[in-house]
Amino acid sequence: MEKIKEMSVEEKYDKIYDQYILTDVIAMAFVKEMGLTDKYLEYSLKVYKKMMPSIMGSAFKFIKMLTPGRAFKKFVEGLFKDGQVTEPLSTTEVVSLSDREAVIKYKNSVMLKKYRDIIKKTGLKLDLKEYWELFNEAGKEMVEDFGFDMTSHIEEDSAITVIKLKK
């Protein structure tokens, strides 16, 4: 047997990312086919809300102590930092940013491309825009706890997210 060389971090990341999306696509297609979409979203939201403190780390407690404008900016900064898990900064563009609203565009989205490729390869009956809307509903409810409103939609190969400070 030939000596197997260690995968690079980039190769590992790419394979893990593909596996994550494949698992997500399978779950959503199954849930949709079984008519369990509402239950799945309800369950996902419950789990994510419990995990929010560990997902956001120390920022979770800290963000609620700040003035609304500063908390909003910290939240948006956190999205940029954590968002690099699915989108490189090179595809991320801040269309507008104030202490009350942020419009973020992920141009030529790596994540959208991966989802489209995997949905096509698997042949599963899943519409990416429909999936995105469901994903957006769960995200919207999570950020409401922080006093923010969030919407997201797909425009061709880009995803646009708008986050607003309520009040």
Annotate each language-model stretch with its function.
Residues S158-V162:
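A beta-hairpin/wing motif
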Residues M1-Y131, E141-E144, D149-E156, K166-K167:
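N-terminal accessory segment detector
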